[in-house]
Amino acid sequence: MSDWDKTMDLLFGFVTGHIHSRMFETILKFSICDLLEDGPKHYSEISKIIGFKNESYCYRLMRYFVPYKLFNESVVQVGLFSKTPSSTQFSKNGTLKNLGRFHCQDHHYRIFESLPKTLEMGKNQGPSSIGLSSFWEHFETDESYKQLFHNAMKDYTSLIIDRLISKISLSPNFKTVVDIGGSHGFLIGKLLESNPNIHGINFDLENIINSSTSKNENFQHPRLKHVSGDFFNSVPEADCYILKYILHDWSDEKCITILNNIHKSLKPNGKLFINDLVLDPSNYTKEAVFKDILMMQYFDAKERSINEWHQLFEKCGFKIDSVDTSISPQLMIVSKINSSNINLNDCTNFNSEIVEEKLKNSLPQFVNC
C-alpha cells in the first residue's frame, strides 16, 4: 500500500462513517442482500426487480461494498454479484438485518448533531435534537420504531442466547426467576426449557407486555408469566433476577433505584445474573467504547468498568461473586452483602475512596472458560 493510500485510508476511516452507513441503509431498505440469497444476479436484473430508473447507479452502489466483503463481483462477468457470509447476515436468513435497520434510522444521525453541546453543557442533549426531552418518549410516539427496536433486540438476543443460557447456572433451591426488562420473554422462556423445575416471570412495562401486538409475540410457556410494572417502583419477588443489557441504559442514580428495589424483593441466598459490558482499560473493544458514547448521548447513561460496577453494586448492598469474560457482554453473578451496616436508604453517604481500597484486596473471581 502506497503512502497516499495509507493517508486516504486514515482520512476515510474518520470522516466517512455517516456517508458509509447511509449507503448501507439504502442496501437494507431495498433488501438487496435478500436478492442474492438464491444465487448470483447481474446488477441489471437487480435494478429491474427493485424498479430503479438508472441501473448503473445500482451497480455503483453495490460495487462500493465489494472491498468491504458485503458482496462478491465476478472477475469473469463484470456486474455479476453473489452473496457473502456478511450479506447473508443482513438478509432475511440472517440475524443482523433488523439491527442494521435500527442503527441506520434517521434520528440516530440527528441525535449526534448535538454532541458538542452535550460536552459543553455536561448533560446529554441528544433527545433535544429530535424534539424530545427523553429518548424513551420515542417509543411512545412512534409505533413502527418501537416494533423495529424490539425486533432488533430479539435478533441481538438470538446471537448470544445459547451461550448465555449455558452460563446461567441456577440453584436447585430456586423456585422463581424474573427477567427484568425482558421484552417479549424470549430469554426467560428459553431458560425455562432447560430448567424444568423453575417458574419464570417476564417483567416489563405495560405497553410492552399487554399491547395487542405484544400479546401475539409474547413467548408462550406453561411455567412463564408475563407481568407488567415499572422497576423504578417495585419488582416481583424472586430467588433470582436476570438483567440483560438493562443497567447500561441508566445513570448511576437510576441504577441505584432499580437495584434497591431488587434488593428488597430478592429472597435469601438469591442471585443476580447481570449481562452487561465490563470496560477493560487495558483492552478497549470498539463495541464497548462505541456503545458507551451511545449511552451518553441517548440516555445520559454509560458502560462501566469493573471498579464502577463494584461501586454501584456495593452502594445497594450487593457484591460481585464472579465475572465470566468468555462471553460478551460479560456475565456478572451478584449476590447480597451479608452486612448490617449498609443503609440502603442513604446511598449519598457512599465513600468511593473506601470502596477503591476494598477493591485492591477483594476483586471478584474472573472466569474465562
Swiss-Prot record:
- Indicate whether S-adenosyl-L-methionine appears among the record's keywords: yes
Top-rank taxon of the source lineage equals Eukaryota
Q: Where is the active site?
A: H248 (proton acceptor)
InterPro entries reported for this sequence:
COMT-like, O_MeTrfase_dom, SAM-dependent_MTases_sf, WH-like_DNA-bd_sf, WH_DNA-bd_sf
Pfam families in the cross-refs: Methyltransf_2 (PF00891)
Q: What class of enzyme is it?
A: transferase
Name the chemical reaction catalysed here: resorcinol + S-adenosyl-L-methionine = 3-methoxyphenol + S-adenosyl-L-homocysteine + H(+)
> Which GO BP terms, alphabetically?
biosynthetic process; methylation
Task: Name the Enzyme Commission number(s) assigned to this protein.
Answer: 2.1.1.-
Q: Which GO terms describe its molecular function?
A: methyltransferase activity; O-methyltransferase activity; S-adenosylmethionine-dependent methyltransferase activity
- Keyword Transferase tagged: yes
User: What PANTHER family does the record point to?
Assistant: O-METHYLTRANSFERASE
Protein family membership: Belongs to the class I-like SAM-binding methyltransferase superfamily. Cation-independent O-methyltransferase family. COMT subfamily.
Q: Per its database record, what is this protein's job?
A: S-adenosyl-L-methionine dependent O-methyltransferase that may be involved in modifying resorcinol ring to synthesize a variant of 4-methyl-5-pentylbenzene-1,3-diol.
Q: What is this protein called?
A: O-methyltransferase 12
Q: Which gene encodes it?
A: omt12
